[in-house]
Amino acid sequence: MNMARQGLFQTVGSGLDHILSLADVEEEQMIQSVDRTAVTGASYFTSVDQSSVHTAEVGSHQSEPLKTSVDKPGSKKTQGEKFFLIHSADWLSTHALFHEVAKLDVVSLLYNEQFAVQGLLRYHTYARFGIEIQVQINPTPFQQGGLICAMVPGDQGYGSIASLTVYPHGLLNCNINNVVRIKVPFIYTRGAYHFKDPQYPVWELTIRVWSEFNIGTGTSAYTSLNVLARFTDLELHGLTPLSTQMMRNEFRVSTTENVVNLSNYEDARAKMSFALDQENWRSDPSEGGGIKITHFSTWTSIPTLAAQFAFNASASVGQQIKVIPVDPYFYQMTNSNPDQKYITALASICQMFCFWRGDLVFDFQVFPTKYHSGRLQFCFVPGNELIEVTSITLKQATTAPCAVMDITGVQSTLRFRVPWISDTPYRVNCYIKSSHQKGEYTAIEKLIVYCYNRLTSPSNVASHVRVNVYLSAINLECFAPLYHAMDVTSQTGDDSGGFSTTVSTEQNVPDPQVGITTPKDLKGKANKGKMDVSGVQAPVGAITTIEDPVLAKKVPETFPELKPGESRHTSDHMSVYKFMGRSHFLCTFTFNANNREYTFPITLSSTSNPPHGSPSTLRWFFNLFQLYRGPLDLTIIITGATDVDGMAWFTPVGLAVDTPWVEKQSALTIDYKTALGAIRFNTRRTGNIQIRLPWYSYLYAVSGALDGLGDTTDSTFGLVSIQIANYNHSDEYLSFSCYLSVTEQSEFFFPRAPLNSSAMMTSENMLDRIAGGDLESSVDDPRTDEDRRFESHIEKKPYKELRLEVGKQRFKYAREELSNEILPPPRKLKGLFSQSKIS
């Protein structure tokens, strides 16, 4: 009767319940077994019970009217995102310039049983997080000097120490501040950090001497240093049982048949692809902190350390303390152990272009005690790097654009923006050759530092104050790319050298990538000055505190100037995509036998030297940033008159591959190669191949600046293999040269300090590689030792001398041939050469 009164949905529902769920009591009694199934649990625990009963629940949770404990309940934020003291050290007066006071793997130090955060971390496998650190010192008023604290993603590698300001950093100046705070996001080649088995450190904190530590008489020869750190935005994944060893010990370890254009972004673009489909790759800045790089002004607008000089008490009023050429190539910071040349970020970028223009910005940061007093005058004299300025007096210098700085007070830094004043629209990069024509100049003027008021101080403090000189640029425009690794030796000890550049994007607007604020964003009276002349606007940023990250980003306007006008170029040569859209040399190899294959990895690692690593421009570029993701375009040039059949294929990292850098018979099947994706070609019908290498990787990104195991696993983009057949080595020569370029879908994240010039590794030419044994000659060299000496000799001769030398050798060989021939007895040839016959 009940069933008859139920509606349709009630009938269907009870039927399904009878089939899928619990039986009624009568059925349980009939089958002599309980028929109750329950699925219970919480979070990542599930329990399925076949003989379950309902939960016995009595009452509910109640809040306390009178709190038993008034602290906030424990949570991931209170336990995992609080500051912990991870390191203590002493900064000593014996520490030299650039001495590394501390080098800390912040994450591994936070993963410590002394810290509450480990209670969360040790039960999880993966995590994503940011890091925030505080570095504290406790100097006295009688101590002076400075430290730089920089958070470096991955590893410092061969990056320039003078360009540490490119990284997230803080500057400690004994006279200005005693604490710095740095907050960084998650920057990693993988989607998450593996606590149990890390590939490499995520963030490395380096603390180095930026200005040497000096003390007064009777003052302690040290100051204490403490480092606090915490996780931010902590995400934990992969609950795991507790094991005995949670972390391993760290260890370190489109073309035509005959013509191909490698010159520009459009013509070097590949039309064919190794990808499964003509697919595109979506942008993903999630592991790069959202800092995507598109323009070289990301580096040139950051002040980096170019030089250092001392303001001594012995300097008299009007004495020239320092003369600096106004060009972007100037840098003087070196180190002898190891031998390093610390290039500035500005010089590193500008050395790769032929011409430059723009406004150079000099930041002069002083390191006094509170008991030092004195003034410096800065002026610039228009001209070039060859002008003589030693005779210009202090009074004469006031005629030129100048600024005077009081070294003592709450502001530590004079920002001196030198406007573009020149007789040519652009200046030349004269460092790429040794001889110059009159009118080919690099610098636009010279900047002179004078003693304006003598340095005074008590006798119990140091009798000098050190001044750091930083260099950057505004409105920088560089054009006409080239490859050049500058050597600081051409400048050190002589202030007549120089270097400078400008940008062809919208003028007078700094690159927003570095987060430069506008003057309107700066609050407080400290950022506003007064001028004695009414109606004249005070210069913005002429005096600042470079130790403060916000004040350091003020756009400098030391002197009035006009806008530079419209660039003559329709293409921005400082665009990362335009510059690296041009194909750059990667490697070359020669086949010496038939039915062989050759595999070469495309690696970004800065520890792999050419010819098995990226050379010159590629090496420099891929170490300018931390993360790369996206496809690459490969151009293969075939050299030699051959009729050879070939096949090429691309292998993503982690799969089976033939031994790299070795010419050998392939151990892989044709099925495997074609499944990966292959192209077939014939060298008689084509002289070049342009192909797009897909972004096929199990990683989020790859990087060239990693430490430990990460340098091996996370630095390789993929591997390219070429196999040949029908090759007759005895009378044919077959060589391949490979060139690499970026694509419109390439992405570059998080800037790094540029490579030192000594780590650039220029490519060797083919003959040098054969002579060094790296490559086997394609054919037996028919030349004798005497032939080689002769060729080596004539290569060193100018053209006129070369012709005379060749003429002598021809006469010599002619005489030898005549003397060796057996001539018949001479006959008289009557009238053969008479005048009548010749006519």
From Swiss-Prot:
(L)YPX(n)L motif (motif): residue ranges: 167-171, 200-205
SUPFAM superfamilies to which the protein is assigned, alphabetical: Positive stranded ssRNA viruses
Organism of derivation: Simian hepatitis A virus genotype IV (isolate CY-145)
Polar residues: compositionally biased ranges: 55-66, 496-510
Name recorded for this polypeptide: Genome polyprotein
Annotated region (Disordered), positions in chain: 55-76, 496-530, 773-792
Site (Cleavage): A23, D24, Q245, M246, Q491, T492, N765, M766, Q835, S836
InterPro entries found in the cross-reference section: Hepatitis_A_VP1-2A, Picornavirus_capsid, Rhv-like, Viral_coat
Region span, Involved in P1-2A pentamerization: 766-836
GO biological process, one term: symbiont entry into host cell
Family affiliation: Belongs to the picornaviridae polyprotein family.
